[in-house]
Structure formats: C-alpha cells, structure tokens
C-alpha cells in the first residue's frame, strides 16, 4: 500500500478515507456505525423547513465525528455519496483517489437533485465539524468549494485530482490549499479502483434493503427510545477519544510514549491500514492487560484545545466515585470534551420524562440551566413519525463518564465499538441515588431507571454479539488486506511487464523498419549494378563491331590527310603575302595618326586664340558700354552746365540791376573784375583738360586691372559684408544687454549708456556703407582710365571752346595741386596696390567734396543774394576766391579728413574693415577742420555740408543721387 506522508500540527486531526473493507455490504458493523441507523431522520434540510441551530450543530457534529475517526467507525455503502470522501488527509493515496473518482462520477452521471444534495452535504459536513477543527474545516471547505464546479461541470472523465492535505502548521492554519493541476489522460483503473467501483455499485443496490432493516430495528426497539440515545452518546464519546489520532494505541504507558506519539505526528509518519487493523484486534484481545492510558492524553492533544467543561467534571465528584475498572487509570489527566459530560439526547416526544430524570441529581447549576434551555427550544418536526432523539449538544462528550462495570469491561478500550452510557444511568446502575433534602424519588423515576437498566443489559448483549461479528470482520479484513497486497504487487508486476513489453515492441518495430529500409536500399543498389553490367556488355559488343569499320575509316583518313597537307602549304604562302600587306597598312596608319595629332594641336592653338579674341571682344563690348555711359554722363553734365549758366546769367542780371540802382562808384567794378574773371575761366579750362587726360590714363589702367580685380572685389565685398553684419549684430546685442543691465544697476550713468548706444548705431551704419565704398572704387577706376584716354586724344589738339560759365571755371583753382596729387598716386599704384586704393579714394573724395563745395554756391536764391551787404565787385571776387579756396581746401583737407594717420593702416584688410570715409576716422578730424574753417571766412562754406549749414548758402542743395550721376 502506498503512503501519503502528510505533515500537520500536533493539534490537527488526520483525515482519512475509509479502508476498502468498509464497503462490503455483508459486514454488520456498518449497521451500527451508520448514522442513518441511529438517526434515520437526520437528513439534509434541503426543503423550505429550516432546522434549529442546536439540531444542525448536533447533526453536523455527528457527521464530523463519524468522518474524522476512521478507526472506530465503519461506514455504510451510501457513504460513497457523502462529502467526507473529499477530505484529502488520507495516507492511502490509491483508495483516496478511487473515492474521489467515484464521487466525481456520481456527480457527473447522477440526477441534478442528488448532485445538489451531495454538494450541500459536503459544505455542511466540512463547515460543522466542530470548534476544535476550525482550521481544518476552513481549508477543506475552501478546497471543496474550489473543486465543486469541476465535479459538476466537467464532461470528460478525469483521473483523480491527487490533492492531499500537505504542509506544516502554518500552511494548515493560515493558507488555503491550492488545487493541483488535473490530469486528463485516460487510463485503465487499477485493482483498488475496480474493487471500489464494484463495491460502490453493490452498495447502491443494497442501500434500500439496509434502510428497511434499520427502520425495522427501530420499530422493534421503539419501546425504549432513550436506549438509542444513550448508546449513541457512548459511541460519540468513544469517537471523541480517538478523534484525529491514527496511532493512539501504539504506546504502552507513560509520558515518554506520549512524546514519541507527538514526535511521530510532527514528522508525519502514518501507519498503514493493515497495521491499524492488526493493532485493533490485538488491543481488543488483550485490553485488560495492556490499556494505553497514555492514549487518552494523546487523543486530547490531537483532538484540539481543552474545553471549559473541566470544572464540570470536578463538580460532578459529589455524586459518587467512578466505577472500579480492572486496571488503574489517571482520571485527572484524562481529556474532557468540548461541552458538558452529559451524553444526553432528548426527543421532543418525551420532554417531561427527561426533565424529571435530570431533577434527582444534584448537578451544578450550569448543567441545569442548559438542559432547561434545551427543553424550551425543541427542534421542529420534519414529517417523521418515529424519531429518535436529537443532539442538544455537539457530539463530543467526556471520556471518563462513570458507567457500570459490565459496560466498562466490555467497552473500556479506545477502539472497540462498545458504547458507554452517560452519567445518570451509570450512577443508577452502580449505586443507589443519594436522597435530596428537597425532593423525593417518585415511582416514575424508579420505573425509568429499571427500564434503562433493562435496555442497558439488552444493549450489552447485543454489543457482545456485535463484538464477535466484528472480530470475524477483522480477520476477514486481514485476509483481504493480504490479498490486496498480493494483487497490488501482481498488478504492479503486470504494469512493469506491460511497460517492458511495449518498450521491447517499440524497439523491435524500430529495428524492423530500419532493416526493411536497409533491404530496400540494397535491392536498389543491386538493381543499379545489374543495369551497369548490362550496359557494359552492350558497349563491349558494340566495340567489337566497330573495330572492322575503323580499319576502313583509317585508309580513308590517310588519303584525306595528304590532301590537307597540300592545302596547308598553299595557305601558308597566302599567309605570308597577307602579312606583308598588313605591315604596309600599319605604316600608313602611323602616318595618319601623326597627321591627326598635328591637326589636333593646331585646333587647340586656334581654340586658345579664339578664347583670347573672345576676351578682347568682351573687353571691347565693355568699353563700348562704358563709352555710352560716359556719353550719357557728358550729356547730363552739359545739361547741368547749361542750367548753371542760365542760373548764373540770371544772377548776373540781378547783380547788374542792383549795381545800376545802387551808388555811383561801384559801377566801375565789372570793368575792374573782367580780367580776373577771364583768368579764372582759363584756369578752369586748363583743369578740365587735365582731368580729361587723367581720365584716359585711368581707363587704360582699368582695362589692365579690371579682369584681375573683378572677381577679387566681388568675393571680398561679399565676405566683408557678411562678416561686418555678423560682428555688428553680435556687438549690438551684447552691448544692448550690458547697457540695459548697467542702466538698472547704475541709474546715474544713463547718459553714458545712451552715448554708447549712439556709437553702436553709428558703427552699424558705417559697416553698411563700407560695401558702397567698394563699388565707388570700381567706378573711380573706370573714370580715371577714360580721363587718360581723353587726355591723350586732346593733347595734340588746341584748347576746346569753354562750355562752362566763368563761375564753373572759377571752381578749378587748384588744378595744379590735384594733377600733382593724381600723378603721384599713379606712380605709387604702379609700385604697390595699397597706395593705389588710397589715391583713388582720395581722388574720389576730392571730386565729391569739390562738387559738394561748388554745388552750394549754385542754388542761392536772389533773396539771399540781396541780403548781402557787399557790392557787386566784392561779391564776384568773393565767388572767385571761394571757388578756388574751396577746391584747394577740399583737395588738401581730403587727405587730412579721411587719412588722418596713414601709418595706422598697415594693410588692405584693415582698410576693408574700417573704411576710409567712416565716421570713426572723420569725427575727430572733422571737428578740427571745422574749427579751422570757422576762423577763416571762406572755409565755413566748405564744411557746411557735414551738418553745420549756414542759412545763406545751403538751402537748395543737390541730392546725393544727382551727384552720383554727375560723377558717372
């Protein structure tokens, strides 16, 4: 038999499934031990009637005890339909699995009402097993609630679940056991399973017969219904002793055996069913010699916690000493049950008799109050005519309830089925009842006692007969157990043999398939060899036939060979001729290659010449464009000169009229000023001729350097413009942030911050104007070259007629200085590029300031002229001086204003970043120049275009755009 080693705590009962012998319908023990025998109407309250609390507790306690003590209780065949089979603590795994399968099949194939009854009985039995097994009931109830849906709703047949109550104290007390995975493989049932199934079906057939027998026995013993009550009370007390203790009677005596039993419980070693049955028979035979007194203590420790009913046992001592047993025991160490020591059941048909029976005993007050309460709360009727008594208390009672010597001698052992009587009847049988001072015993009480004694005697006789039958059953059980072992070993050997044979068959099959495959391969190989042999034979026969043909073919080939040799000689001669011809062709090809290379070289030279000519053509086109621009500029200048001439003529007429209306002496002023004016006109014409010569020279220089400087100027302009914009943005952003921070920190320096901002704005505008300067440099070069060309043309010719008025000629007073400056700049340009740029910028600025200085003289209104207090002669001389001085001062001061320190500008890069006419360079020098000009009367008009304009001469000034057109 297999063992399921389940660990549990010292206070938890071991829940076992009943042994297979319990299911034989022929054993008489199951008639006594079946709860339906003593309580035929102890049924499931599945209708609308609600049972009372005490009745449900009593019936549930009885079921719990009948399940929890498998040693002293054998179950009827209808036990298989009850839920106690689902308690998983059995040591015999095979029988437990068989019972699980049987209940599952009953739930699967039974009627819905039977299934619902089975499930309800499971929950009721596991939920009302008693207060001492709360943890076990909790875990088993949880396990059943987890398993019930699987039982009811699974359609396929399943193997046993194999869910055992395993684990230590903490697992049993605190955790719900998890269900193990189910096995769905279909297997043949083992011997135990088939045996249990056959017993189950036989038990179902004989169940109705047993119920009829039980009802007949109840009717025969219906005269003393209390006898059943007392008998069952003793039985339940006997069960309470051995509750949860599979190894109770293994020890002899003493505390050491008790410790050993506890140790065995902790280690989880559980004896098999055969050992327990043998020990039962031995203890029954020698019960008087070997009573395990220590088993009581062990059953107490295994049963649960001590109940508060121990002082009740002490209070019952005045009733009299307990009956003398044939051996010594320790009554104080014996465990007490969970409730009162009265194993008293009452029926609602005899409430008065029970109450009168309790009265003569001087029991303590708590027992009386409890019995009185039970009297006034009888369980309701459930439609049963002949009812035995219900359980007023939970079914566990005190172990050492006093009883008669006969009953103690028969039923003193723990595992016998003799059931001791409770306290009142045993006292009446052993000694006379003590007389109470308040009450006297009536004849009814004595009659009840006599009837009880008669019932006790009848029951003891029946018990003795049943003991004999039980002994026979034990012997049969031992034999059956041996048979079971042998059959199990045979079945195991058979299973191993089946496994080995199946394994051998599989190996044989594999070898057979392997050999068959090898045979097929060899057959194929043999077939291939035969085919090859046949082909070889055919080839050999064909070669012998071909030998004769080869001889004839050889003679034919010899004749052909001679012919081929003759043809070969002819072809060699032709080949030599072709080689000579090919050499001639190669020489001709080389000659043609040389001619082709020469032609390609000539083509390359022509292409280069073509590029040069195209470049000359482009230059000519550019010069033509410049010529057209110059012509347009000359036309514009002529128009401007004409306008100036008309304006000067008007001014002259105005002066003449003023002179006529004025005093007499100034009339001689024009006569005196005429030679001076003619001299000024001559000087201006000479200056014009010099400027034209310079223009031709500058045009030649421009033609030489325009191709070189064009790309460099464009790249430099783009790079400097980009760099200047990034620097200006960076400087403006940073300086604005810093200045704003300083304005917050130092409010007294707001003026300094504003000045810094103005300087930054000025720098930004300067950098924007720098790009314009580069463009102006290019235009200056063009004008200088054109002036050189024109000067070369007009040198041989005489002086051209003056197209300008004397006022324009007066503006060319410093021609000698300007020509010397430009000539010196030209010599420096030939030496170094830096001086070329400086000279060109100086010349441009000189021309600009010359034009700007002469322009304010032109648009002077007659009103401003009338406001002059001077005479006509003095005014004309002033004009002449102003023109000459303006031109001279502008050419002289231009280098001072815009080139204050030439040594501080070492390279062209510095000039590009800081332009020559930037306000940074102009600002301090301009102040000095203005201060110098303010001291002299003529220099103020030259500096008035910078921002300090006089009210007399600077009102209608020409715009910058018109001056640019004049320069072009």
UniProtKB/Swiss-Prot annotation:
Coiled-coil annotated spans: 271-291, 449-645, 676-705, 748-773
Residues bearing the modification Phosphoserine: 253, 281, 307, 731, 804, 816, 840, 912, 918
Keyword Transit peptide tagged: no
Domain of life: Eukaryota
Residues annotated as signal peptide: none
GO cellular component terms, A-Z: apical plasma membrane; bicellular tight junction; cytoplasmic vesicle; lamellipodium
Keywords: Cell junction, Coiled coil, Phosphoprotein, Tight junction, Ubl conjugation, Wnt signaling pathway
Annotated region described as Disordered, given as residue ranges: 152-258, 285-343, 721-742, 785-834, 853-956
PTM statement from Swiss-Prot or TrEMBL: Polyubiquitinated by NEDD4, leading to proteasomal degradation.
Keyword Coiled coil: yes
Tissue: Expressed in exocrine glands, including pancreas, submandibular gland, lacrimal gland, parotid gland and sublingual gland (at protein level).
GO MF annotations, alphabetized: identical protein binding
Location(s), subcellular: Cell junction, Tight junction
GO process annotations (BP): blood vessel endothelial cell migration; establishment of cell polarity involved in ameboidal cell migration; hippo signaling; positive regulation of blood vessel endothelial cell migration; Wnt signaling pathway
Compositionally biased tracts (Low complexity): 203-224, 853-878
Primary location: other
InterPro entries in alphabetical order: Angiomotin, Angiomotin-like, Angiomotin_C
Motif PDZ-binding in this chain: 965-968
Polar residues bias locations: 152-164, 177-187, 726-738
UniProt record similarity statement: Belongs to the angiomotin family.
PANTHER family: ANGIOMOTIN, ANGIOMOTIN-LIKE PROTEIN 1
Function: Inhibits the Wnt/beta-catenin signaling pathway, probably by recruiting CTNNB1 to recycling endosomes and hence preventing its translocation to the nucleus.
Protein name in UniProt: Angiomotin-like protein 1
UniProt organism field: Mus musculus
Classification of source organism: Eukaryota, Metazoa, Chordata, Craniata, Vertebrata
